[in-house]
Amino acid sequence: MVRLSYVRFGVAWCIAIIIVSGFSNAASDNFYTPKNGWRSSSAGDILAWRSIDASGIKANVDLTVAYQILYRTSQNSPKNPQHSVTTILVPKNSVKNKLVVVGEAQDSNNANSVPSVGFVSGSRDSPNLVVDESLLVPYLQAGYIVTVPDSEGPLNAFTAGRSGGYQTLDSIRATLSFDKLSLNKNTTVAGFGYSGGGQAISWAAALQQSYAPEIHVAGWAFGGFIPNVTALVHHADSSRASGYAASAITGLVDAYPDLEKASKSLLTSDGQDMLDFVRSNPITEVVSKYANVDVLGSKFFKRDGGLFLSKAYRDVARQNMQGTSQNEVPHVPQYVYHAESDEVVPYNSALQTVQYWCRHGAKVEFVTYTDDKLNHNNTQVTGSQPVFTFIQRLLNGKKVSWDACSFVKENTGPSASSSAGGPHVVPIPTGGHHTQSGSAHGGHSSEHAASSTHAPAGTGHNTSGTGPHASSKPSPSLHPSTGATSPAPSSHRETSGGAAGFGARVASRRRAAPPRTMPAPPLMER
């Protein structure tokens, strides 16, 4: 069976052709099981490798070869050995010593939804891969070798972001040391991802300096990322995106033995059935089944909201919360984007995290998409072209134009893609599916509303937890005192033709007056 997915990337149409035949299964494929003694190897060591026929990508770009590497990595902590797989795509006339690592939005706890299975066997259980493959095409056409790790690892632990960071960084190590490629330890690396893939990339950015300082990273780009799992669960619960809340809970339970043990006394039989369903089905089925369901309620937990009262959960949530440690502030340039109207990952949690990073020396351009027609899904393609421009500039040795942090608002609407499924392909139930098409940030004018802001302590945007992005459910205390703020825009306007380093953007900007300090948000014991 051949499935076509059309995505407009700038002015060019990308056609992802997924050839489905003879489905592989990670659980039954011996390649995914390392040989005895693998735990004594070092992080990033290659345990096994194989050549593959990446049928979906080959239909769109001329690949010289594709490989998969089984490599040693870490789970939850550098002290806990783990293994994972990365898929390497080598285009014809590949550029030497430049590597792009991609955070694939698996967003699923299902073993057959991992990127490496989707590349080999098609995307039956990896619906997000349909679009993400399309978005790889410009990078491959530019000659960049691309590595796509299974960043959820063999536990398929969606939202276990810290592990995703380790597994992403170790996929880079393994790829750079692979002797079949024209790469070496001095290779320049850049990475991008969205949603769960954005979470893995953002954690790679946060952990790189302490965990893999030898990697020469030029910068990172990510959107729709998950810096606070509890905020996602509260935000998505009892909405049409409730399936993401169920998947987030399941991922943490599967990744942390103490939480898995505690869950047995917290879950009802329906709750255990919910986790089993999440593990056994692709995210499309999970989102459909649990749409508008209160997954935190008494049907699934023996005590309403009891999950958040568990010490085991609070400990795990803190370990996977970003914007809480000065030792985990990314030190290379970042391009981050998020839709204010994101119905899955609350906008404020992303904003608060970036503000924290900025107060501690990060270099970030944070783009807020303000059009209320944008959702979690279609924001991915809307932001894909500026992400490509950012990555390409960095790999070409060009510096970004911001010295500290820049907060920008754009009213760019969604591509004429599905408001239901969107370019990210997971259909949040709204009663229909649409063909993916339209402009991906290339055909609209945009309003930039805010500022080259250096974000000293106590500056930023409104994070008061009110408005359309705040959860209506009461939540336990969660975010540390970040001194969140709200800007007071002035009427001054400045016209810029790609001033933030993206020549493709021609837009109007207005500078914001110094933000005023607002009360710190609660720590969402998320």
Curated annotation (Swiss-Prot):
It comes from Malassezia furfur (Pityriasis versicolor infection agent). The active site is at 195 (nucleophile), 342, 376. Residues 413-423, 430-457, 480-490 have a biased composition (Low complexity). Gene3D superfamilies: 1.10.260.130, alpha/beta hydrolase. Keywords: Glycoprotein, Hydrolase, Lipid degradation, Lipid metabolism, Secreted, Signal, Virulence. Residues 1-26 form the signal peptide. Its main location: secreted. The lineage of its organism: Eukaryota, Fungi, Dikarya, Basidiomycota, Ustilaginomycotina. It is found in: Secreted. It catalyses: a triacylglycerol + H2O = a diacylglycerol + a fatty acid + H(+); a monoacylglycerol + H2O = glycerol + a fatty acid + H(+); a diacylglycerol + H2O = a monoacylglycerol + a fatty acid + H(+). GO terms for biological process: lipid catabolic process. It is an enzyme of class 3 (hydrolase). The keyword Ion transport does not apply. InterPro entries: AB_hydrolase_fold (IPR029058), Lipase_secreted (IPR005152). Secreted lipase that hydrolyzes acylglycerol lipids such as triacylglycerols and consequently releases free fatty acid. Can hydrolyze 4-nitrophenyl palmitate to release 4-nitrophenol and palmitoic acid. Due to an absence of fatty acid synthase genes in Malassezia species, secretory lipases are essential for the yeast to generate free fatty acids from degradation of sebum and assimilate them as lipid sources for growth. Plays important roles not only in lipid metabolism but also in the immune response of host cells and pathogenesis. GO terms for cellular component: extracellular region. GO terms for molecular function: triacylglycerol lipase activity. Disulfide bonds: none annotated. It comes from the Eukaryota. Glycans are attached at residues 186, 228, 377, 462. Its EC number is 3.1.1.-, 3.1.1.3. Residues 516-526 have a biased composition (Pro residues). Induction: Constitutively expressed regardless of pH conditions or exposure time. Residues 412-526 are annotated as: Disordered. This is Secreted triacylglycerol lipase LIP4. Belongs to the AB hydrolase superfamily. Lipase family. Class Lip subfamily. Pfam families: LIP (PF03583).
